[in-house]
Amino acid sequence: MPSQSANSETTGVTSDAVALWEIVSVVTSALIAEWVVLSFVRQSKLIAAIPILMALGLMLWSHRERGETWRDLGFRKDNFVSACRLLLLPTAAALLVIIVAGWLTNASLLAGNFRSRFLWLPLWALFQQFALNGFINRRAQLAFGKGAKSILLVGIVFSLLHLPNPLLAVVTLLGGFIWAAAYQRQPNLFALALSHSVVSITMALTVSPNLFNSLRVGFKYFG
């Protein structure tokens, strides 16, 4: 019996370590794309995509190895309304703060022009939420369980990926907390992407680009 208990504890520790290693690997790939690749090859987005594709490959492999289905990850519709209800108040509060910030900084109601790239933003938001919550949040839960520790880790990771933009890092830290908490209660990536898209578009349209340095992160922040 003691031997079985020891083996169980060892397996648990190993599983936690692997989950954390997976998080570190994916985050490192994203940071390499933001900082290292773009610092040497500014004009080629295809080259910058290489570490991102490697991270995506690791994520998909990990999901397969752990037997996680797309529904498990949050690509589902049965709890979409419930997830939206969880996100309604924090998203509305975020929109109010953003609009007031735009007004206080003397930006017009539509500080930025509606660009065609905004049409693709929901897909980009869905991908980010898939990586942030469908992968990182789930791995954080394997290491620390549901609750404050794993939610804190998700928020910190999301903020880290938006450095060195200080204001954007703070905003994404708070957003990361909210989305991570909502995901743990109602895992629905479509609802998270909807909230993410609405907040991002509102920020781009109502807040002066100078306040967030045109939402630049990584090496692009400097020019």
Predicted regions and their residues:
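Helix-capping/transition residues at the boundaries of transmembrane alpha-helices
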Residues: 38, 141, 183-184
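Hydrophobic core segments of transmembrane alpha-helices in multi-pass, intramembrane catalytic enzymes
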Residues: 50-56, 120, 171-179
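N-terminal, membrane-interfacial amphipathic/helix-forming hydrophobic leader that caps
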Residues: 1-70, 204-223
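Aromatic-anchored segments of alpha-helical transmembrane domains
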Residues: 28-38, 93-102, 155-164, 198-208
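Function-critical hydrophobic alpha-helical transmembrane segments in multi-pass membrane proteins
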Residues: 98-99, 103, 107-160
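Interfacial transmembrane-helix boundary/kink motif in multi-pass membrane proteins
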Residues: 5-28, 52-53, 67-95, 112, ...
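Short, aromatic-rich membrane-interface segments at the entry and exit
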Residues: 42-51, 109-115, 166-173
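Functionally important transmembrane alpha-helices
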Residues: 169-223
